Swiss-Prot record:
Belongs to the acyltransferase 3 family. It holds the Pfam family Acyl_transf_3. It comes from Bacillus subtilis (strain 168). This is Putative membrane-bound acyltransferase YfiQ. Its main location: membrane. GO terms for biological process: enterobacterial common antigen biosynthetic process. The keyword Membrane applies. The chain crosses the membrane at residues 11-31, 44-64, 82-102, 119-139, 153-173, 181-201, 220-240, 252-267, 283-303, 308-328.
Length: 362
């Protein structure tokens, strides 16, 4: 069967991440011109924060749906080739670019330090892959327990753990990702900050049909929760003490969950996935992993176009940072081992009128 909701959510999530980062860059470069609406822009940026949790949620959802009784032999080896090896390569590229951008001579020691921080601490855009691999390990170790345990208890406990974890570090480490300050600057990588999403995705994927039926039965609750949680995160962004624009906030956890439910409910009503959405979904991993580096091109473009208004600037960068990763991934995947550098392009297997999705859990 075709889990069309997955393709739609994956597409929307990766595009939302790109848009979020582009708006942040334009806001930084045009800070004076946009000063009067900066709060409004920040609120909109906050509303895009569901994207990374939703993208990561999909990985465990597909595992639970495809492998409820345990993953097949060679699972981690296969995932390592198509996901983790590209992660290591892009981590090296990022380390080289970031150490070069710091000015002065690029030393081997500085490169190694940044590379190790990228790989082990998730100190770059690819941190989400570390979270996904933790989900793989958790699924392999605990799927038997989760099958037997009460979902109400598991979800309740995991919700409290994740909310407490995010709440503490949101207060203790308010510094942005680029600033290594606070109690633990890379708190978003350990699974505790994502445990609720993992448990929720497991049960939603395992009981997919029942999950959709419940969403349909309580659809007005789903609509209301999305609106209420959206209003909450906007309010917190305006007046709350937890003012950082980040998906690693306890209120964002509520909002992201509501948006995931809303997307599953709405997209379950679709008869088919639009071709453009399917196309972008198939390249979503590469877009997510590579778009930040095409923003360097966008940065140079905007520096040479100081008079360009904010909206055209966002549209220009959005085109560059979406098309760039797609073309790069397409070109490298023409070579036998090109996927080892940028990830494999997902190609749904057609079986008459059905689409099998289990070979791409992330």
């Amino acid at each position: 069967m075709q889990i069309k909701e997955i393709f739609m959510i994956r597409c929307i999530s990766c595009l939302s991440v790109v848009l979020l980062h582009i708006i942040s860059m334009v806001l930084m470069l045009q800070a004076e011109a946009l000063a009067d609406i900066s709060h409004t822009v920040d609120s909109f940026r906050t509303l895009l924060m569901f994207s990374t949790p939703a993208f990561i949620f999909i990985s465990e959802f597909l595992l639970a749906r495809s492998y409820p009784d345990g993953v097949p032999d060679g699972f981690l080896k296969k995932r390592g080739k198509v996901i983790f090896v590209p992660f290591l390569f892009i981590a090296a590229i990022d380390a080289l670019l970031m150490t070069s951008a710091m000015g002065g001579e690029v030393t081997f020691l500085a490169f190694v330090q940044k590379y190790l921080a990228n790989v082990f601490l998730g100190n770059f855009i690819g941190y989400f892959i570390l979270v996904i691999f933790q989900f793989y390990m958790l699924h392999m170790m605990f799927h038997e327990y989760l099958k037997k345990a009460s979902p109400k208890w598991v979800l309740s406990i995991s919700f409290v753990v994740t909310a407490a974890y995010l709440g503490y570090f949101s207060a203790a480490s308010p510094a942005p990702a680029s600033e290594e300050g606070g109690a633990f600057p890379f708190f978003w990588v350990p699974f505790a900050g994502w445990l609720f999403y993992f448990c929720l995705a497991y049960y939603c994927g395992k009981e997919y049909k029942r999950f959709l039926a419940l969403l349909n039965q309580y659809r007005w609750v789903v609509y209301g929760a999305a609106i209420a949680s959206g209003a909450l995160v906007v309010t917190v962004s305006y007046v709350g003490e937890i003012g950082m624009i980040s998906s690693k906030r306890p209120d964002i956890m509520l909002y992201s969950t509501s948006m995931i439910f809303l997307c599953f409910h709405l997209f379950s009503k679709m008869k088919h996935v639009p071709k453009i959405m399917m196309f972008i979904s198939n390249y979503s991993f590469s877009i997510y992993l590579l778009h930040a580096y095409f923003m360097i091109i966008g940065y140079v473009l905007l520096l040479n176009m100081p008079e360009i208004p904010a909206v055209p600037a966002v549209l220009l960068l959005f085109a560059v940072c979406t098309a760039g990763p797609i073309m790069t991934s397409w070109a490298l995947n023409k070579f036998k081992y090109g996927y080892l550098f940028v990830g494999k392009i997902y190609q749904p297997k057609q079986k008459k009128v059905t689409v099998e999705v289990r070979d791409h859990a992330g």
